[in-house]
């Protein structure tokens, strides 16, 4: 069995405590949790009224034609992947090869996306 090597060259993240690695690191060092009261949850009748909301305007950061086919979780993953490319100092053209991969994680779809999907049903 041939061993294959993997190299982590860059990281990117968007979260309720920051929209890039520097902001997230600073928030962690300062003990900022990012959890706050969410009035929208109250309006929707949720029992829990708190959330770790991400404060970023996706429509300002992603081309409209691309964004219209993305859910919020996919959009956050996309922006995080672009940050990872910048962190690695790699050009976006690197995606033209089949020797690159992105490992992405998400806490799940947004509550708003779930409510919208239920309304469609």
What are these regions (language model features)?
Residues 1-121:
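Conserved "HGTGT" condensation-loop signature of ketosynthase/thiolase-family condensing enzymes
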């Amino acid at each position: 069995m041939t061993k294959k090597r993997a190299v982590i060259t860059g990281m990117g993240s968007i979260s309720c405590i920051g929209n890039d690695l520097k902001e997230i690191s600073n928030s962690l060092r300062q003990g900022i949790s990012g959890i706050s009261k969410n009035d929208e949850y109250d309006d929707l009748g949720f029992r829990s009224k708190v959330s770790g909301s991400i404060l970023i305007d996706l429509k300002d950061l992603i081309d409209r034609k691309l964004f219209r086919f993305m859910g919020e979780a996919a959009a956050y993953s996309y922006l995080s992947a672009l940050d990872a490319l910048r962190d690695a100092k790699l050009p976006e053209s690197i995606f033209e090869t089949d020797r690159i991969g992105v490992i992405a994680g998400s806490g799940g779809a947004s509550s708003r996306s779930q409510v919208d999907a239920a309304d469609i049903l």
